[in-house]
Amino acid sequence: MLKFIQNNREITALLAVVLLFVLPGFLDRQYLSVQTLTMVYSSAQILILLAMGATLVMLTRNIDVSVGSITGMCAVLLGMLLNAGYSLPVACVATLLLGLLAGFFNGALVAWLKIPAIVATLGTLGLYRGIMLLWTGGKWIEGLPAELKQLSAPLLLGISAIGWLTIILVAFMAWLLAKTAFGRSFYATGDNLQGARQLGVRTEAIRIVAFSLNGCMAALAGIVFASQIGFIPNQTGTGLEMKAIAACVLGGISLLGGSGAIIGAVLGAWFLTQIDSVLVLLRIPAWWNDFIAGLVLLAVLVFDGRLRCALERNLRRQKYARFMTPPPSVKPASSGKKREAA
């Protein structure tokens, strides 16, 4: 059992998601419906996209705490371009390019200037948030065109166009990380940096790519945010970076790099979003959301930590088992045989 969990760390997140879906069903049978699933998925899309980007960065043994600010900055650019009369495709492409550029800048600080990731992205968190507020003057962006909201309108099976795009991106990234040499380079870089270099992996380039794609995912999350609510507040993206990191940790992505699967991060994001829907079902006031979500997250992390210790003990036991096995005992020769030999 431990070996199975060891090879499938996202199983704990899946169990948490299933339990959080089934248990409220005993209070309200209507909760157990396809409509609930589509509603939770629609709410989870932003966090899923951010968790996917954070996964790439964390696999390389880094962390990015600026993605919330990138999301807000990119959402503001999208709104400004649309209100200036640019078409939706042009505005979306420019928004994605801005996110890519912001992520590239983060990666360059870490890979080329050797600044610790947490320090570099703490700096850019304030920088990007400041740019966002300078562009807006501290005001909200409203009056966005109706075609933007159509991106989040139900299209097929109750899922929007952006929802289907998110599913495709999850499937593609899961395949990329699991089945290609390029994807395995992220694991190698985070697991053993020097070893990866000796194997020919361009570790600096991999880290820059990870941060760049993370920024692009944050920009896409900004587009989703704007399309879902139809306006852009000046606090857009605040606090999302911590939720994205928490979703990854819940899904089995190691903070030490080199291990985890993208599906685990997606399940972690779904779990955190589903907590909010359960609290609404239980009619718990909204100001309890962060407290209860943090409490549940802490409980899951404690359980995950204890499980990790058990797995490590199991691995050590397997590794050194052959050295600890006592040698077979040799039976002493009988006294009769000794006399015959004499």
UniProtKB/Swiss-Prot annotation:
Part of the ABC transporter complex LsrABCD involved in autoinducer 2 (AI-2) import. Probably responsible for the translocation of the substrate across the membrane. It comes from the Bacteria. Keywords: Cell inner membrane, Cell membrane, Membrane, Transmembrane, Transmembrane helix, Transport. One of its GO terms (cellular component) is plasma membrane. GO terms for molecular function: transmembrane transporter activity. Pfam families: BPD_transp_2 (PF02653). Residues 1-13, 60-69, 114, 176-212, 273-283 are periplasmic. Its main location: membrane. This is Autoinducer 2 import system permease protein LsrC.
